Amino acid sequence: SRISGTSLASPHVAGIAALILHAHPDYKPADVKAALMNSADKLNGDYSVYEVGAGEVDVAEAVHNEMAFKVQDTTIIGDGNGGFIENVYEKGALTFGAVYKKDDSVNTTNRTIVFTNRGTQAKTFDVSAEYSKPIDTVSAHVSDAVANNVTVTTSSASVTVAAGEATNVTATVNIPASAERGQYEGYVNIVNRDNPNEHYRIPFATRFVEKGIEVVEVASPAITTLPWSHPW
């Protein structure tokens, strides 16, 4: 029988994470997450990346693969003293966030992907984008990237990483001003040129929106202004 749900998935993923750490005791949390996500297998059917993430965990690949692909990102958090600081962190997904419409231009934003080769031989990868089909369900609303000429490009379509080295690749989302407002999703596929069976994927998502309100002043008695209460 097939059983689903977070209560079943969580202990399975925790067990797989334990196997990864047993094989790689020096891994940090971001390394474990990247190992789980990079090597995940594509599911049958059409889903939002917010429903299935990178896909189905491949235990053997997650434990034994020699490559890691981590996205560098930032977030603003409260410093506990009434101010804010920029926190830099790594993850296994490309979250481009909200892209605001500009008149008569292509709207872009980018992130850096770090390709790390922990193996003993150099590897060359072909990099391409795969776009999710439009979805309009109760749980997901995904716009048609192909029909709206929305693209995700990388600074190089072919990337060689020397043994024991790391290489930075810039991923950019490009959204024409004429594109439909909405959510665009898909995957960046990374395939070993000499061995297509070695392949990895990074989910991506972005929202194309009209520019919203820049500043809001709230009444303190109604909504707290203490940053440690809502550091976002």
Task: Annotate the PLM regions.
Residues 1-47, 178-181:
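Hydrolase catalytic cores
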Residues 59-120, 221-232:
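Beta-sheet-dominated interaction scaffolds and their linkers
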Residues 104, 115-122, 132, 178, ...:
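Short solvent-exposed strand-capping/beta-turn motif centered on an Asx-Ser/Thr pair
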Residues 105-112, 167-169, 178-187:
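Short, solvent-exposed loop/turn segments enriched in Ser/Thr/Gly
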Residues 119-147:
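Short acidic, flexible loop segments centered on an aromatic residue
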Residues 142-177:
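Intrinsically disordered, low-complexity Pro/Gly/Ser/Thr-rich segments with frequent PxxP/GP/PP motifs
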Residues 176-214:
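Terminal connector regions
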Residues 206-230:
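Low-complexity, Pro/Ser/Thr- and charge-rich linker/hinge segments at domain boundaries
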